[in-house]
């Protein structure tokens, strides 16, 4: 994703970390985060919050989250990395793109498990709310504070404050012309659209067709990626502020109906919210190109398909073949549709090679993790996965503070390495604290609230059969919540 892609070249580079540079996400650093990644990442955002023990069948996901988060940090920490190492890495791979792609595969794999096991749309959205928003609001607040004291800057994608506030309400700033604050939250826009699609597909009982959706979005990235407009609505229709307001109202109303009503109205509400999200993703992206956005959805549904294969709902031969095909489509979309701009032929070749390696290695990493899912992992690695959402959202602010306090560009190689190691230690300590005192307590609040809502209004579960063993799904659900 060019977003994860940092930069106008749509790839993130060391400079992507600069607040004023339009680079990729992280840009999730590469316009690509999370987790929640899932975690994001969220599971849905880059990090997951349910601890899966080091020997648990879900521990491998925590290990992958931690690895993905560190790749994103490396991408934004580029100006602190010894130039010799940094330059060689970017000749072959964009760490930000790679990390975010891994996060999106994880989100696709783990998030549907929670929704399908419990069968409750209301519980799913309450879980998402308390899983993602508390730390998200903290990260936005910290970024604003640093901007006010002239330590951090804004990227400038969204020049209108009201539009930025409205777009941040639904974590959809990257498809509503809002400011991505902090810069890595661009990836949460695509996580949110994925959740909306999952909800609508689940309520329509067509959610098991994951392979078809993965192939469809992958093919759309190749066929339509160079045709669909970028930021069409905000540039050609009403003002960005009005579009963001209308989108917020329609999506929130649709979700309220889907969560609070019964029968056909709730299905219509879910479908309406999903249609708005998908339309914005395809036509109104302000940082990623349409081919990048569609490739992201293809990767997430590929993760879902692999989850179904692991649960016996697809044959492994079929799942692997389709996964390879989707990765090939995502690679083809990037090579075919990216805009070379002022790049020389050699620079264009390096970009294409980096894009290929980022997508390919993300898929390979996920495949290796899935293959060794029953291995017992070191506790430190699984802990990095648990705090990965904090690492993803908070590392840009810590980098700004670190850069303000110290500069290492002229130090010797080993002194610079020691300073970098100190930064990582501080980052892990801070993110461990936010996980223990912000993320985990608020997740508990969400679980208690969901139970109270069930007691007050009755369960809203859909009778959707799941073939996977109950114990396995229980683990998956806890990891996604």
Residue ranges and their predicted role:
Residues 192-238, 250-271, 307-320:
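Solvent-exposed interhelical
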Residues 59-115, 133-136, 140, 364-365, ...:
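Functionally critical transmembrane alpha-helices in membrane proteins and complexes, commonly lining
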Residues 132, 136-196, 208-209, 216-235, ...:
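Membrane-interface helix-loop-helix regions
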Residues 70-77, 217-231, 273-286, 325-339:
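Aromatic-anchored segments of alpha-helical transmembrane domains
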Residues 404, 413, 440-481:
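Membrane-proximal cytoplasmic C-terminal regulatory module of class A 7TM GPCRs
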Residues 97, 292-308, 320-440:
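Alpha-helical transmembrane segments of multi-pass integral membrane proteins
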Residues 97-101, 114-152, 159, 164-167, ...:
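Transmembrane alpha-helical segments and their boundary/interface "anchor" motifs
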Residues 58-59, 88-100, 178-190, 229-250, ...:
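Interfacial loop-to-helix transition and helix-capping segments at the boundaries
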